[in-house]
Amino acid sequence: MLFILAKGFDPRMCLGLEKLLNAGGNGKCDAVLIEFSEGTSSPSNAYWQLVDKNVAKLEKLMGQRGTIASRPIKTHSKEGHRIASRSASNLFKDINEFAGYTDIVLDISATPRAVYMPLIAKILHLLDKTPRNSLGAQLNFHLFVWEDSDLDRDIRDEGVEESAVYVHPYGGAMDREATAGQPKVWIPLLGEGQRPQLERIHALVVPDEICPVLPSPALNPRRGDNLVVEYHDLLFDRLRVEPRNFIYCSERNPFEAYRQITRAIRGYRNSLSPLGGSKFVLSALSSKLLSVGALLVAYDFKATNIDIGIAHVECHGYYLNETVQETRPQCRGELFGLWLAGEWDDRD
């Protein structure tokens, strides 16, 4: 097994690996530790002690089970441009890099969106383009996500960029002159405390129609209502969102989010086809679970030569609520495992 995780201060960094190893079995387990820096001025640098603690825990967990290999990701080009998503997409370039393993596990619990989205897409692409009787057909690809909505709210984006960008490789078709006149439909997955990001993405996309996604049902039955209250003036007064345009999906089921968003896109494509076509942009501003659902939508449509954009706003780092460090030595929440490709997947 190859276990892939990102280095960081998030207390969930090693929880998935710990649960997996404690479940038993003596098979070989190697780890790939993704390393990246948001810059010397990043507020995340203040939590270096938490990072060291997580790395020490990783080394202790691995013990004699296998090796730990570090793979760096560049977040900025020489010109100062953000290239994290493109770098993440190039982390693995060939299916043969997974030779000797039966399972790949990617734990995104402590991984930024700009890194895990293109990385998931790249691994799926490597597996899908591999012939049925070759190495890729024998690999299982699993995704681990430790969901803790309270902790997510306590880790805030700091230094949000002034403009939004499209996550590589989901955005190249959005600015084509040949389709400039096509209506744009924007589908943002709403989460708490994301007003600046919503405003910047709206400025990038300039949509003709907006279909916000609300987490409902949710562990907190009023979470969807609270999000509507939080963004009421933005959604209804400024962006003129129609109440009938809201999409609802369970906050703990990315495959339901996938189905609901896919259904909405197909409906709009059929309705707008007399106008010469349409464009769609997704924005995952919610939990990692729902973000995965949005990514799978874009991935599957791209496989059929239909480009779906994913718009995102980068940040300079993250701020961790100090009370969390003092009062929450242990994480709450729950580990989710998604089996995205492998033995169950008949690709013939």
Model-inferred region functions:
Residues 1-103, 111-348:
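Long, low-complexity, Lys/Arg-enriched
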